[in-house]
Amino acid sequence: MVKAVKGQAFVVTAGHAAPASIGMLVHQTDDLVTDGDGALGVTFIDNTTLSLGANSKLIMTAYAFQPRAHRFAFAATLAKGSLMWVSGRMTELAPDAVALYTPFGTIGVHGTRFLVEVDR
């Protein structure tokens, strides 16, 4: 769910860009995009928090958080820009189910907070 928006930020679903607004739901295959003055904060149901800086693009490829069914997945690619990550419950319950990809490598997330920047 979108928790914070500054400037131009968008949630892209099936190729359709919608201006991000507080309370907007983010689905497992959405892209998150910010322009030059944009910033976007998103919190997922496991309490993982992502903050995108200006000129950023995050491509979501998988998200599942179903502890009772033992189904966990979080995969995304930071194609450009900056991202602050604060881990939620998924990294406690299934750390190997979480991965952040960049054009330069993969970050395995095991219960932490970090900032990553991709220059393209």
Report each predicted region and the residues it spans.
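Flexible, surface-exposed loop/linker segments and immediately adjacent secondary-structure boundaries
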Residues: 1-31, 36-39, 44-120
